[in-house]
Amino acid sequence: MLLNGEDGSMTIKINHVKEYEALVEIYKKEGLDTSLFGNRIAAIIISGDKIIGLNSVPGVKIRGEEVENGVKADIEIADNVKLPFPIHLCTGYLRSEGYQKVIFNIKIGKNSIVKFTSHCIFPYAKDFSHEALTSIKVGENSWVSYEDEHIHGEGVRMISKTEIELNKNARYTGKFSLTKHRAKELKLEMIANLGERSVLELESKVKAVKDDSVEVREVAYLKGAYSRANLKSTVIAFDEARANVVNEAYGFGDYAKGHVECHEIVKGNADVQTVPLLRVKNDKAELTHEASIGRINEAQLMQLMAKGLTDEEATELIIRGLLGEY
């Protein structure tokens, strides 16, 4: 049975209210924005293989289906929609063991401006596998931002693949962050096809510790004339962690421009590899690359230590700056 307020309030399954409340409490504990659970927010709230909360707003249709081991959701944004609040995607798993698969099909119409705030909440995971497949199609002249933040326990194996299609004059900004909790085993892949004059920005930030294993792949196919892409990845690897980062940009369209930026810092016995792949098949296209890998910049360290910080404090401050944690 579904509880659906006549006033347009969040639809919550009665027999899953406790799980819903538990997720809200985790948001509070982690300092996340609990207003995202409000009635004015378009949202889907998932726990394991159940949809425990669902809310649509004018211009946004969210349809969810419970499937084996997970959930499939179709999210459609109409033309000419400008949402004042983000669309909230909450994927939770509150047990310590198991497997979860989520599939999101997202379609944005023309001339719309929307923001997605996605949280994956697996705080108690000890032996848990999570698979996420996301398809995002952005219509002409629409602007979309998608922020994906993760709260993990000690034992998460995660595979995430996102495919993005940008039509003429569309803009997409995607940010992935796993910096406050363990990665354990992470395979992250984002692939985008860019139409005429479309703009893509992808940014991934990951901190790997202990024996974590991280693989990041960002790919941009600049097919349309005057399309632009900026791919940026930051990986901080400690202890015995391993990381492999691949950034690919393909220049096909006239006057297409792409830039790849990789920053990887190694501390302890970590093993990090970064592979930039730039390919141009049009003499009017332009691709550039910037990379740094290895220890923390010595000049920055000395500068901070001259101000009274210890080596450890200076190192931590630089790392927090790279990860955007102030």
Curated annotation (Swiss-Prot):
Q: Which InterPro entries match?
A: Fe-S_cluster_assembly_SufBD, SUF_FeS_clus_asmbl_SufBD_core, SUF_FeS_clus_asmbl_SufBD_sf
- Coiled-coil stretches noted in the UniProt entry, renumbered to this chain: none
Classify the source by domain of life.
Archaea
Mind listing the GO biological process terms from this record? Answer: iron-sulfur cluster assembly
- Which family is it part of? Belongs to the iron-sulfur cluster assembly SufBD family.
The protein's name is Iron-sulfur cluster assembly SufBD family protein PH0883
Q: What organism does the UniProt record list as the source?
A: Pyrococcus horikoshii (strain ATCC 700860 / DSM 12428 / JCM 9974 / NBRC 100139 / OT-3)
